[in-house]
Amino acid sequence: SVGIIGANGAGKSTLLLHMNGYLMPTSGTINIGDVYLTKKTQQAIRRKVGIVFQNPDDQLFMPTVYEDVAFGPLNLDLEDNVVQERVASALHAVNCYELRDKPPHYLSCGQKSSVAIAAVMAVGPDILAMDEPAANLDPRSRRSLINLLNTFEHSKIIASHDLDLIMDVCQRCI
Protein backbone atom coordinates (compact mmCIF):
# COMPACT_ATOMS: atom_id res chain seq x y z
CA SER A 1 0.00 0.00 0.00
CA VAL A 2 1.17 3.49 -0.86
CA GLY A 3 0.17 6.75 0.76
CA ILE A 4 0.23 10.00 -1.18
CA ILE A 5 0.57 13.19 0.82
CA GLY A 6 0.83 16.79 -0.28
CA ALA A 7 -0.56 20.25 0.22
CA ASN A 8 -4.01 21.30 -0.99
CA GLY A 9 -3.89 21.70 -4.75
CA ALA A 10 -0.74 19.57 -5.13
CA GLY A 11 -2.53 17.15 -7.49
CA LYS A 12 -3.24 14.12 -5.29
CA SER A 13 -6.86 13.79 -6.40
CA THR A 14 -5.93 14.56 -9.99
CA LEU A 15 -3.37 11.75 -9.93
CA LEU A 16 -5.99 9.27 -8.69
CA LEU A 17 -8.47 10.40 -11.35
CA HIS A 18 -5.81 9.86 -14.03
CA MET A 19 -4.95 6.41 -12.66
CA ASN A 20 -8.56 5.33 -13.12
CA GLY A 21 -9.06 6.95 -16.51
CA TYR A 22 -11.62 9.52 -15.33
CA LEU A 23 -9.14 12.09 -16.57
CA MET A 24 -7.08 11.46 -19.69
CA PRO A 25 -3.55 12.86 -19.98
CA THR A 26 -2.98 15.79 -22.31
CA SER A 27 0.69 14.82 -22.61
CA GLY A 28 2.82 11.89 -21.56
CA THR A 29 1.49 8.42 -20.82
CA ILE A 30 -0.13 6.57 -17.97
CA ASN A 31 0.23 2.85 -17.62
CA ILE A 32 -1.22 0.56 -15.01
CA GLY A 33 0.94 -2.53 -15.02
CA ASP A 34 1.56 -3.22 -18.68
CA VAL A 35 -1.61 -1.50 -19.93
CA TYR A 36 -1.30 2.02 -21.35
CA LEU A 37 -4.27 4.28 -20.69
CA THR A 38 -6.03 5.12 -23.95
CA LYS A 39 -9.67 5.54 -24.92
CA LYS A 40 -9.63 1.88 -26.02
CA THR A 41 -8.16 0.61 -22.73
CA GLN A 42 -10.10 2.93 -20.43
CA GLN A 43 -12.67 0.29 -19.42
CA ALA A 44 -9.97 -2.30 -18.72
CA ILE A 45 -8.09 0.24 -16.57
CA ARG A 46 -11.27 1.02 -14.64
CA ARG A 47 -11.68 -2.68 -13.89
CA LYS A 48 -8.10 -2.75 -12.55
CA VAL A 49 -8.24 0.49 -10.54
CA GLY A 50 -11.32 1.26 -8.46
CA ILE A 51 -11.55 4.77 -7.04
CA VAL A 52 -13.31 5.79 -3.84
CA PHE A 53 -14.10 9.51 -3.93
CA GLN A 54 -13.45 11.82 -0.98
CA ASN A 55 -17.14 12.62 -0.65
CA PRO A 56 -19.23 9.43 -0.69
CA ASP A 57 -22.24 11.49 -1.81
CA ASP A 58 -20.40 11.94 -5.14
CA GLN A 59 -20.37 8.16 -5.52
CA LEU A 60 -23.63 6.91 -3.99
CA PHE A 61 -26.69 7.68 -6.12
CA MET A 62 -29.02 4.68 -6.17
CA PRO A 63 -32.21 4.30 -4.07
CA THR A 64 -30.73 1.62 -1.79
CA VAL A 65 -27.33 0.55 -0.53
CA TYR A 66 -27.75 -2.81 -2.27
CA GLU A 67 -28.43 -1.16 -5.63
CA ASP A 68 -25.41 1.13 -5.21
CA VAL A 69 -23.07 -1.77 -4.52
CA ALA A 70 -24.62 -3.85 -7.32
CA PHE A 71 -24.36 -1.06 -9.91
CA GLY A 72 -20.76 -1.79 -10.94
CA PRO A 73 -21.03 -5.58 -11.17
CA LEU A 74 -24.30 -5.27 -13.12
CA ASN A 75 -22.51 -3.05 -15.64
CA LEU A 76 -19.91 -5.78 -16.09
CA ASP A 77 -22.74 -8.00 -17.39
CA LEU A 78 -22.18 -10.58 -14.68
CA GLU A 79 -24.76 -13.27 -13.94
CA ASP A 80 -27.32 -12.29 -11.29
CA ASN A 81 -26.07 -14.89 -8.81
CA VAL A 82 -22.48 -13.60 -9.20
CA VAL A 83 -23.68 -10.02 -8.63
CA GLN A 84 -25.57 -11.10 -5.50
CA GLU A 85 -22.49 -12.91 -4.16
CA ARG A 86 -20.22 -9.92 -4.84
CA VAL A 87 -22.62 -7.47 -3.22
CA ALA A 88 -23.08 -9.64 -0.12
CA SER A 89 -19.34 -10.26 0.17
CA ALA A 90 -18.45 -6.57 -0.20
CA LEU A 91 -21.10 -5.43 2.28
CA HIS A 92 -20.02 -8.07 4.80
CA ALA A 93 -16.38 -7.00 4.36
CA VAL A 94 -17.23 -3.43 5.40
CA ASN A 95 -19.70 -4.52 8.11
CA CYS A 96 -22.67 -2.93 6.33
CA TYR A 97 -24.71 -5.92 5.17
CA GLU A 98 -27.55 -4.99 7.52
CA LEU A 99 -27.83 -1.62 5.70
CA ARG A 100 -28.47 -3.18 2.27
CA ASP A 101 -32.13 -2.07 2.05
CA LYS A 102 -31.60 1.45 3.40
CA PRO A 103 -31.42 4.58 1.24
CA PRO A 104 -27.83 5.92 1.30
CA HIS A 105 -28.97 9.44 2.21
CA TYR A 106 -30.10 8.10 5.63
CA LEU A 107 -26.65 6.76 6.50
CA SER A 108 -24.01 8.43 8.65
CA CYS A 109 -20.90 9.74 6.92
CA GLY A 110 -18.90 6.77 8.21
CA GLN A 111 -21.50 4.32 6.91
CA LYS A 112 -21.57 6.08 3.54
CA SER A 113 -17.78 5.85 3.32
CA SER A 114 -17.91 2.13 4.05
CA VAL A 115 -20.65 1.56 1.47
CA ALA A 116 -18.67 3.54 -1.13
CA ILE A 117 -15.69 1.25 -0.48
CA ALA A 118 -17.97 -1.79 -0.80
CA ALA A 119 -19.29 -0.49 -4.13
CA VAL A 120 -15.76 -0.36 -5.51
CA MET A 121 -14.77 -3.72 -3.99
CA ALA A 122 -17.78 -5.42 -5.60
CA VAL A 123 -16.34 -4.67 -9.04
CA GLY A 124 -13.22 -6.62 -8.07
CA PRO A 125 -10.40 -4.21 -8.92
CA ASP A 126 -6.76 -5.12 -8.34
CA ILE A 127 -6.08 -1.67 -6.86
CA LEU A 128 -8.21 0.44 -4.51
CA ALA A 129 -7.44 4.14 -4.99
CA MET A 130 -8.90 6.23 -2.18
CA ASP A 131 -9.12 10.00 -1.93
CA GLU A 132 -9.16 11.20 1.69
CA PRO A 133 -11.05 8.14 2.94
CA ALA A 134 -11.18 9.42 6.54
CA ALA A 135 -12.42 12.93 5.70
CA ASN A 136 -15.35 14.00 7.89
CA LEU A 137 -15.23 10.88 10.06
CA ASP A 138 -15.43 11.00 13.85
CA PRO A 139 -12.56 9.33 15.75
CA ARG A 140 -14.42 6.05 16.25
CA SER A 141 -15.44 5.79 12.58
CA ARG A 142 -11.90 6.74 11.55
CA ARG A 143 -10.44 3.93 13.67
CA SER A 144 -12.98 1.48 12.22
CA LEU A 145 -11.96 2.57 8.72
CA ILE A 146 -8.26 2.04 9.50
CA ASN A 147 -9.01 -1.42 10.88
CA LEU A 148 -11.10 -2.20 7.81
CA LEU A 149 -8.43 -1.01 5.36
CA ASN A 150 -5.83 -3.13 7.13
CA THR A 151 -7.92 -6.26 6.50
CA PHE A 152 -7.94 -5.76 2.71
CA GLU A 153 -5.57 -7.76 0.57
CA HIS A 154 -5.99 -5.33 -2.33
CA SER A 155 -3.19 -2.99 -3.28
CA LYS A 156 -4.17 0.39 -1.90
CA ILE A 157 -3.22 3.89 -2.97
CA ILE A 158 -4.44 6.44 -0.45
CA ALA A 159 -4.28 10.21 -0.92
CA SER A 160 -4.68 11.94 2.42
CA HIS A 161 -3.67 14.76 4.75
CA ASP A 162 -4.14 12.32 7.64
CA LEU A 163 -0.55 11.28 8.30
CA ASP A 164 -1.55 8.94 11.12
CA LEU A 165 -3.91 7.07 8.80
CA ILE A 166 -1.15 6.80 6.17
CA MET A 167 1.29 5.49 8.79
CA ASP A 168 -1.26 2.95 10.07
CA VAL A 169 -2.32 1.63 6.66
CA CYS A 170 0.49 2.17 4.14
CA GLN A 171 3.92 0.59 3.85
CA ARG A 172 5.25 3.44 1.70
CA CYS A 173 4.54 7.13 1.36
CA ILE A 174 5.25 9.59 -1.45
Give the predicted meaning of each segment.
Residues 5-7:
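The feature captures the beta-strand-to-loop junction immediately N-terminal to the Walker
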Residues 20:
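Helix-to-loop junction immediately C-terminal to a conserved catalytic motif
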Residues 28-36, 45:
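Conserved ABC transporter NBD signature motif
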Residues 81-99:
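Conserved ABC ATPase "signature" region
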Residues 103-107, 111:
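Conserved ABC ATPase signature
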Residues 128-131:
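Catalytic Walker B motif of ABC-type/P-loop ATPase nucleotide-binding domains
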Residues 160-161:
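H-loop/switch region of ABC-family ATPase nucleotide-binding domains
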